[in-house]
Design a protein with these regions (language model features):
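Append "with occasional cross-activation on large, charged helical scaffolds in nucleic-acid assemblies
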Residues: 2-171
Length: 171
């Protein structure tokens, strides 16, 4: 039995290539729409917050700013999860990379979702990126901006490639 299994594995092989993360155009479009909806939802949340957050509904024991950041993180995490689900559904269960992830051989479905779908919001100690320049994370963005991209949301995937600002946010 062992010899037969080794023989099958040797003849068939079990490798993954860059084309295993290929998505059809409709999947890429759907992921792009999900990321855009997430960014729009963050903008709407920032609009609700206003300039000082005095009328913003807070959670018990949290300041308005802490509540805002938690809400934004939930929105962006949901967008990442949705785009990952789209990528997973289009990759299919017969894909070698998916088989490796689901069998536990190497990687995970989260890794595949980041390679094919969307990377999402990088976090430092459970929070969005905060440090960098004075009142902003990168000099590319206006001061005191709290939008999705301004605080590090990465809508691209590793396969599609990253913008320079996205690359810096992940480093």
């Amino acid at each position: 039995m062992t010899r037969m299994t080794i023989s099958i594995c040797t003849s068939l092989g079990f490798t993954t290539g860059i084309d295993d993360e290929d998505l059809p155009p409709e999947a890429k479009e759907e992921i792009s729409l999900i990321n855009q909806r997430g960014s729009d939802a963050v903008d709407a949340e920032l609009e609700k917050f206003g300039k000082d957050g005095r009328r913003y509904e807070t959670r018990p024991g949290r300041t308005p700013l802490e509540t805002l950041e938690e809400n934004i993180l939930m929105i962006l995490d949901e967008a990442k999860t949705e785009s990952g689900n789209v990528a997973k559904s289009f990759l299919g269960s017969d894909n070698a990379a998916v088989m490796m992830a689901t069998s536990g051989a190497r990687g995970s479905m989260d890794n595949l979702a980041m390679m094919a779908g969307s990377i999402g919001q990088p976090k430092v100690r459970g929070k969005r990126l905060e440090r960098g320049y004075q009142d902003r994370v990168l000099a590319h963005f206006p001061r005191n901006s709290k939008g999705a991209q301004e605080k590090g949301f990465v809508g691209s995937s590793f396969k599609r490639g990253l913008e320079p600002t996205e690359f810096f946010m992940l480093s």
